[in-house]
Design a protein with these regions (language model features):
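N-terminal loops that bind phosphate or other acidic moieties
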Residues: 1-366
Length: 366
């Protein structure tokens, strides 16, 4: 059954993204280089896993879709996390509308089309060369496979290949990626999740490709090869807006105007997102006046789980961390070095402060 596939494969794919969170974080240069894309995607997926695992055995795909929608909305962190939540919602709702016990190629294509519809609706100003581009490209590939009367297995395999090829094209679409010599972090995170999910379905749980996540200034594309050192441009002038502000919102009125309030958020900053359905929403915006944003929304309902962080400071910390790693790599050879496996950026920072020479991103599967 489709429900069993999602229930069994989703946690495995989420764990792979968690294991690669630090690697994804290092690629994070857009929209601001605050180094948290992998962490935010992992936290969002992790909340969904908890919701799915809380369901009774034999839960339907409709039940699982509701759990994915609710879990991803409640747990969404950061710009990447909120967009990921909408991708998951759209695809899950699409799968829930499938009629048969097994997903057909048409079901897969339809679910991805719905994912594109929901995710792009949530973002006022979609940017090419990001996670949304990869989503659209794999959806287009699924449509092509449906027209070619491909089997579901052939379609899934083709989607994985297209996901990484789309990631490899991101530096050609978004100049800041080319300038920094990397692919888009969110795009790579989504491709990783897709491959990990398909591999779990194919009986290869926890396996993903080695993907070269760097590009050179002459235009050589990223490719499936071996992950090499990431050369990050440390010079960043800063964003016009300093504070990443996000919170959950419960509207007081059934007439809450989503469009008008999204327009207000846009007037206060950028990367504005207002997702969900009345009365419960997730709100995200980069702004210089989080106080005004919160006050505005308090007049329209209740707010909770407020999270405000200074992106300038995060970018500085990320730059310093990269600089320290470079200095350690280029320094004189030591008679004895320490290598540690860290399950996440928080542990990596602690180990680095203790003098560990090399940090390897990993988790429970290592």
């Amino acid at each position: 059954m489709i429900a069993n596939v999602v229930r069994n494969c989703f946690p495995v794919a989420a764990q792979v993204v968690a294991d690669k969170a630090d690697e994804i974080n290092k690629l994070n240069v857009f929209p601001v280089p605050d180094g948290d894309t992998g962490t935010n995607m992992s936290l969002t997926l992790g909340t969904v896993v908890k919701e799915i695992e809380a369901l009774p055995q034999g839960a339907s795909m409709d039940d699982i879709a509701k759990a994915i929608t609710h879990g991803s909305l409640m747990g969404a962190r950061g710009n990447s996390g909120v967009i990921t939540s909408q991708i998951l919602r759209g695809v899950a709702e699409g799968l829930a509308s499938s009629k048969g016990a097994q997903a057909t190629t048409a079901d897969i294509a339809s679910a991805l089309r719905n994912g594109v519809k929901v995710a792009f609706k949530a973002v006022r100003k979609p940017v090419e060369g990001t996670i949304l581009t990869v989503l659209r490209d794999v959806s287009t590939k699924a449509d092509q496979m449906e027209r070619a009367k491909a089997t579901p297995q052939e379609t899934l395999d083709a989607i994985v290949v297209e996901a990484y090829e789309s990631v490899a094209r991101t530096p050609d679409l978004l100049p800041v990626l080319r300038e920094n010599g990397v692919v888009d972090s969110g795009a790579f995170g989504l491709a990783t999740f897709i491959e990990a999910f398909v591999n779990a379905y194919n009986g290869k749980a926890g396996e993903v490709s080695d993907f070269r996540t760097t590009v050179d200034s002459e235009g050589a594309k990223a490719q499936v090869a071996g992950v090499v050192d990431i050369e990050i441009n440390e010079d960043w002038e800063g964003s016009e807006f300093r504070y990443c502000t996000e919170f959950l919102f419960h509207a007081d009125s059934p007439d809450f105007d989503e469009s008008a309030n999204l327009k207000y958020l846009s007037s206060m900053g950028d990367c504005e997102l207002l997702v969900g359905s009345n009365p419960d929403y997730k709100i995200h915006v980069h702004t210089n006046r989080p106080d005004r944003v919160l006050r505005h929304m308090l007049h329209r309902g209740q707010i909770f789980n407020v999270f405000v962080h200074n992106m300038d400071l995060e970018a500085q910390e990320r730059t310093e961390s990269i600089r320290e790693d470079k200095q350690a790599a280029s320094g004189p050879r030591k008679p004895l070095g320490f290598v540690a496996v860290a399950a996440g950026s928080g542990q990596a920072d602690i180990l680095r402060s203790l003098g560990v020479d090399v940090i390897v991103s990993g988790g429970q599967t290592m």
